Amino acid sequence: MFALFIYLPRYLQLHTQIKRKDISKKIVRSKKIFLRTMASASLPPPPPSSTSLTSQQSSPPPSQLPIRKMPGSYGLPLVGPLSDRLDYFWFQGPDKFFKSRSEKYKSTVFRTNIPPSFPFLGNVNPNIVAVLDVKSFSYLFDMDLVDKRDVLIGDFRPSLDFYGGIRVGVYLDTTEPKHAKAKSFAMEILKRSSEVWLRELLSNLDTFWETVESDISKNDDGASYLIGLQRCIFNFLSTALTGANPSVSPDIAENGWKMLDKWLAIQVIPTTKIGILQPLEEIFLHSWAYPFFLVAGDYQKLYNFISENAGDVIRLGDEEYGLTRDETVHNLLFVMGFNAYGGFSVFLPSLIGRIAGDTSGLQERLRTEVRKVCGSGSGLNFRTVNEMELVKSVVYETLRLNPPVPLQYARARDNFKISSHDAVYEVKKGELLCGYQPLVMRDANIFEDPEEFKPDRFVGQTGSKLLNYLFWSNGPQTGTPSVSNKQCAAKDMVTITAALIIANLFLRYDKITGDAGSIKTVVKAT
């Protein structure tokens, strides 16, 4: 669902943080889980469509901006990429890495290197053009200018063995014939899943919150909920998206989410800052790609489970979209596992933590809105949740400050000129553009007080205009996914699902306290 997501760096960091916390409290000692994971007048006019995003202007039009030689450097061969790799993973971290270079070059567009790189990943070219403001970042989604072939996590691509030897839809450019088949198939299964989506979500949320309540009653320090949340997400998505209910397989029901955790982690280790003791992390985790055989057994179990229990969806892929059985199952596993399960596993703890840790009165405002809209017998459904402006704004603001996809990539189809807010630069054919979303979404030219969490930022007419510049789904929030672009097929389902989770929370509870890893207390609705 979070198509083209590369949310995993935050996913692994979150798991590591939660695991440390749980170990220190002796809550889950036996869990050896590797993963943890302007005012209206001042705004530029919105982009007219998702395929012509570069026409948006937040400064003078390109013809009036100065042409500037692109700053930055790749450094000496081997030495430059290695130095940048150590800064990125060790000495600075991703935020400071990009921010310090932007300040040094006095530009939001510059050349640099990004991991993975030398010594044992010699086939990966670490050279990138960093784009760190909303205006230049939008070029990543202009499919006339850029190619999305095999750039999910930059120039590095995990072995195709992780996907049964198939280039699944996320690795295909829009010009490749199979992209239209895979994207259309994904959009159709999402459309069909809407019939059971709400029912399965609410059913699994009931189980999740009952587990949290039980754990809180047994532990004065609260309940670590990430594992329960992942189990909830896995069961919900498997049933809603593929029709394969994990309850038919005891092994999958108990361990399916763990299998996905390992499959996800092993693919992206070379690109991910985890935060363990250096230089051990650099030596053992960032120096080479890990082989598929480490998770081959688990992946085969997941493949067999989908193949045996998702018959209707598999027939749909074959009869209506011309996909082979293998292509259908591997694409389903990627959409469900990498995009949806992985994305929600990162985003939902951020959302729950933001609400549970708030002391500004936000919970009372959310509770009031939810109960007002759901009152008078209306209940909670897609229609009523769409009327909850504050709830939706909180979802959008969390996505802005904590995008589950930190990095977005695209390769220049030909030479072209790229505009930031204050200059124009020349990009050469074949160069890899890289946008670091946590900085892009803090663009002060677009967002007032960009570092602050403002729950009602996207409320009202002025707030709705800002949705043109909210990029988390491989395109703007106002964009429309289609076979001609790479925008997340489930862009709208993601945000409405998150809103449903908030609404369900405040129908169940008057108040909760906690953070992104644990719930301390819950006060049941009165």
Named regions from a protein language model:
Residues F458-R508:
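Cytochrome P450 heme-thiolate "Cys pocket" and heme-binding signature region
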Residues G435-L467, W472:
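Conserved cytochrome P450 K-helix/beta-meander segment immediately N-terminal to the heme-binding cysteine loop
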Residues G154-D155, S194-L348:
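Cytochrome P450 heme-thiolate monooxygenase catalytic core
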Residues L86-K99, E103, F110, R371-Y425, ...:
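Conserved cytochrome P450 K-helix E-x-x-R motif and the immediately C-terminal K′/meander segment
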Residues G343-R367, D492-L507:
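Cytochrome P450 catalytic-core helices
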Residues F34-L35, A39-Y163:
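N-terminal membrane-proximal hinge/A-helix region immediately C-terminal to the signal-anchor transmembrane segment
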Residues P61-K69, Y74, T112-P115, K148-L205, ...:
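Cytochrome P450
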Residues M1-T16, A39-P48:
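N-terminal chloroplast transit peptides
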